[in-house]
């Protein structure tokens, strides 16, 4: 037994049901906290979230978290579902729809480290009279890996500052977002800022500076630096 297959009750126009699978080491490990859930916030799971039961596999790509769960199978092979075998896989930027071979790549399971800026928003206008700017956001990494550092920049990545992390800094079984914030002095004379963020997880994985080297035809695994452009208003 190498895989645990999960099949949902929903189906597409061909009649094929949605399915996915997890490696047995993920599905059955007590350190991965995989569950079959029937309640959400103390009440039965809502229909749109998978009533009556669904799989919850924290740290794993959402495509494996099967809703409306109807069948579980222990198997030597992964799910035969289209969405396991022929979707949600990453490829080189050189691969296009004419050359792609989905059998050549493994199905996405744990996701890469990522982060985002929530405040300020793209296009925001801040006053130079404030003399400082406060940034807020979140960071997260797949597989339960904790976030050990978040770096932020006000000049497009030329110089960096370490953000403050909120709450307990768990290095393993870290399933939730790690919130971060930073209050920084405004660069003198600047009339615009390009704010960037990148995170580092507990195995020292970090993020690429642009999408170019990780672009893929399916648009998955996109974890380049998040950038936000803001204006500085001077009286």
Regions found by a protein language model. Name each.
Residues 1-235:
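Extended, aromatic/histidine-rich regions of cofactor-dependent oxidoreductases associated
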